[in-house]
Amino acid sequence: MSENPNPAPAATPSLTLAVTTTGANPLAFDPPSLEAPANTVIQVDYLNDSPVPHNINFFAGADSSAESLGKTTVETGPGATESVIFRTPAAPGDYYFWCDVHGAAMSGMLHVH
């Protein structure tokens, strides 16, 4: 596991979610959307099980122009794993995530409620 470039929040995560990229569909997150409560520290475990380099970057808005909430480093699979810990936004809504390597071609939504 690589060192996360974003420091973790001081709190322990109260929810852990998992996201995978597989060799069968190397330009997609599985699942393509996640759900979490507002203003909650979460951990997202990312498994890159494809041979293509990827990461996952969560944004504080509906697209990549917003500030990053947290991201993993770029990992080359198969079998590379890394976790990112961050606090979800206080406002309910849909928040964008993507792979920094592939941009909008590989993205998803974090539904905060």
Question: Predicted segment positions?
Answer:
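Short beta-strand and strand-turn-strand segments in soluble, beta-rich domains
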Residues: P26, D63-G70
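N-terminal edge beta-strand
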Residues: A10-V41
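Surface loop/turn signatures of beta-propeller and other carbohydrate-active proteins
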Residues: K71-E75
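Beta-strand cores of secreted/periplasmic/IMS beta-sandwich domains, seen most often
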Residues: P32-V52, E82-A90, H111-V112
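Beta-strand signatures of extracellular beta-sandwich domains
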Residues: N55-F59
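Solvent-exposed coil/turn segments that connect beta secondary-structure elements
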Residues: T22, D49-P51, G61-A62, H102-A104
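Extracellular/periplasmic metallocenter environments
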Residues: N4-P5, P9, P13, T76-H113
